[in-house]
Amino acid sequence: MRKWLIPCAAVLLCTLVLALCGAAYADEAENITGSCTVKLCSKNFKAAKITDGLYTSYWESDKTTHPWITVSSKDPIYGLYLCFQKMPEHYQVQREKSGGEWETLYEGDTRFHHMYYPIDGYKHLRVYVPDKGKTTMGFNEIFAFGEGEIPDWVQQWKPVPEKTEMLFLATHPDDDILFLGSVIAWYGIEKQRNITVAYLTKSNTTRRSEALNGLWELGIRTYPVFGEFRDVYANPNRISQAYKETGGKDKVQGWVTELYRRLKPEVVVTQDLEGEYGHPQHKMVADAACTAFELAADAGKYPDSLALYGTWEVKKLYIHLYGTPREQVEFDWTVPLDSLGGETPNERAADAYAMHKTQVGQGRKSNGVFTPFSVEEFGVKRYPNNIFGLYATRVGPDIGHDDMLENIEGIEE
């Protein structure tokens, strides 16, 4: 009889493990958006544009009083995920009561353009602007979920901190992933540092959603900062023209100065002074980052941000590809990391870049040959994303050349 005990126990154990695994998978909430009925307050777009999961299409209401959308389902809804194209200053998430009246479940959180709301199994929901006066509301996507665990791709952001250890300043959504993505993953995930990503421009509302999707895929959970500057391509040989067409040198440098004062980073990391492939706005952002290193510490500059946040001395400023080996830190992004699920930082950055749907297929032409943007081609081969130069420091030179937080006091592992 004993000979049968071991195989029987093994079978029972395997059955139990499989049952538990099946239950774990079954616990994930089903995306029931496709079976929902979505109605819009204005008919200028089809509702399918905000339920196709593409983010590249959108619906925006007419400018009207109390814009709204409703989401109805034959099955109970346990989660509503809103990806705004045009977020009003105030909105409410409501459910329809049996008498046809609407009960407010949430006063809308306007800190995040992608926002998830748990719902208690209601079948008829409305997103509604209660304020008087005409306004607009729009969405890139909406999702409804059944009961269960929220899928990993649904974003639940932490707010922008009052104080960050490291600020990664990018020009456009996707620049952060192409050129800074691996170092962001290293410090933000592997090293668990308090990091914040900022963009000079969101470019447009679709690319703002792509930026959020890319950062989330990278593994970052702190909401980024978006500037409101125009996305332009000026004469690549004239930074002055890039400043002018972006909104003016004073405004751009003032915004970066305010960013330093507001977030109080110990270390700032930004793009190449030569603009990687020569993009004038990349050059401009790097120039502004360098100038703001001194401006943010000067009580005589930019009195408005001074009144709000005071002065701030950034300790170290790193520029992509800057300098000689004496000024540079160099990383190895080819080592798999447990914190990244066994991926290398470059592999994780490539995953994140795939979220930038509008940029996949875009690229550069050189000597008659077109090359699409990718982390492998532009972030590794052409403009190595593992090399950064120490442009300015208030804490002395780097000795180890492998850690941007070297010489920064008060930061513990």
Enumerate the predicted regions with their spans:
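Positively charged n-region of N-terminal signal peptides that target proteins for export
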Residues: M1-W4
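The feature marks non-catalytic terminal segments
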Residues: D27, T33-Y58, K158, L295-E413
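Active-site beta-strand->loop->alpha-helix modules in alpha/beta enzyme cores, enriched
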Residues: T65-P67, K86-E89, K97-Y302
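Disordered, acidic Ser/Thr/Pro-rich linker "stalks" and the adjacent N-terminal cap
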Residues: A24-I77, Q85-Y91, R95-W102, E107-G108, ...
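Bacterial N-terminal signal peptides
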Residues: A9-A19
